[in-house]
């Protein structure tokens, strides 16, 4: 008998890689943009994924949209407290119901686009949490090691 098809994980269910389907899709889009620009792909750092998820959840829970968290402080504070070392770092935030809407919004903003295409960044973590006024919160954390 033919093997049963493997069901696709729901967007909020982590796969074997530890990433949700939404998170993997966002990372794929980021790395496609980088490839088009002749840049190396970003490696996934699961510690950054954890922080990015915490940030997205915090924005929904506390009903804000800002790089400065009332709970955690700046993204750089979050990274330091987690013991993550870096030469350079950045954060992108988006509120959108789909990965394509979130990605398009970020790419159409010069500052966010600059983070995605920053040649000094080597690693990324993406955290997507469904809910809130936008349908989902998307946090991208970047570091250059």
Which residue ranges define each predicted feature?
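Loop/turn elements at helix/coil->beta-strand transitions in domains of secreted/extracellular proteins
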Residues: 35-37, 84, 89, 121-124, ...
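A generic, residue-level signal for flexible/boundary positions that often mark functional hotspots
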Residues: 33-38, 42, 59, 87, ...
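Short glycine-/small-residue-rich flexible loop motifs, especially phosphate/cofactor-binding loops
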Residues: 31, 76, 113
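Short, surface-exposed glycine/acidic/tryptophan-bearing loops
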Residues: 49-99, 103, 116-118
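N-terminal targeting leaders of exported, membrane, and organelle-targeted proteins
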Residues: 1-54, 64, 129-145
